[in-house]
Amino acid sequence: MKHNFGAGPCILPQEVFQEASEAVKDFNGLSILEVSHRHKDFVAVMDEAIELVKTALNVPEGYSVIFLQGGASLGFTISALNMMRNNKKASYINTGVWSKKAMAEAKKVGHEVLECASSADHNFNYIPKNVKVDSASDYLHFTSNNTIFGTQFEEMPKSNAPLICDMSSDIFSREINVADFDLIYAGAQKNMGPAGTTLYIVKDDALGKSTSPFLPTYLDLQTHAEKDSMFNTPPVFPVYASMLNMRHLMKNGGVQSAQKRNEEKASLLYNEIDNNPLFKAAVASPDRSIMNITFLMTDEARTDEFNALWQEHDLVGLKGHRSVGGYRASMYNALPLESVRVLVDVMKHFSSKG
């Protein structure tokens, strides 16, 4: 058995793999890959997927749930276009690569982008606390979890401006209050399902109010809210697999139970990092992610030796991003606790070798 700590696409439950693979061969007489998105069987899939999102996250009345394509990278543009108002000013909290990409897209569509807080001064190893949002901002945008640097907002920022969040890498991993947000978007391939679909949760009152002179029909969230995500052919298989994964999530206690499991896994690994003299955490303690744990070796001369050891034990995907170096253990919902125990045992064994 391989233990997948890769940053994404994410590990999924074996039950989901099995059901999805069976549907590729036979989904009510056809393959899920060839069924029409207008067929009642797939309409039922889409309806269930939307309802599962609402149930899992306790989405209140007055919000629309939408499945699109393009990943969070398109979400940077969609969010900026749809939330543009008369001031054409947007505040962003800069916590790393994905925040900077979102800021760049907002500039391209015509916003004056205001960096209201940043952790760039320490290579993004903490979450900035002194967030000062310009009162004229159309919205405040932030990335809730940073896969590359291993930081995560424990508490969501407060603002009088509408709040937008890229939750691609921690959606469904912990409880949130959806009512705090005007717009949430998330690529599927971290906790929701396979790559190919993107989730949007948008406040209905925010729809149809963009002042952008250039808002194509497809990029207008109102288009998709009115058509129940069926304006054009949706990504049928990714939506189906995501629906299966959300079924599995709810069958196993929902987001509340997933959060407890995720916190247990993270605590186990952080405890080893903090107490093993051969390793050190890359992130300040209060802001450590429970999804993507970044750590370094105290003696880089032994890197090859440690790499050989963890690979020998069928651990995969541990190499850190070049921006940080070291190691990154991505521990999404479906990663079993046993996989974390194997990693911790490998680290203990490495330390015992002196």
Feature names for model-found ranges:
Residues I164, V178-Q189:
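Conserved active-site segment immediately N-terminal to the catalytic lysine
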Residues K2, R328-G354:
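PLP-dependent enzyme catalytic core of the Aspartate aminotransferase-like
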Residues A106, S118-I171:
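Active-site phosphate-binding strand-loop segment of PLP-dependent enzymes
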Residues F279-L309:
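Conserved PLP-binding catalytic core of the aspartate aminotransferase-like
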Residues G29-G75, N82, V97, E105:
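Conserved N-terminal alpha-helix of the aminotransferase class I/II PLP-enzyme fold
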Residues K2-I50:
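A glycine-/small-polar-enriched, mobile loop at the entrance of the PLP active site in fold-type I
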Residues M84-K100:
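Conserved PLP-anchoring active-site segment centered on the Schiff-base-forming lysine
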Residues A188-Y270, A284, K353-G354:
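Active-site C-terminal subdomain of aminotransferase-like
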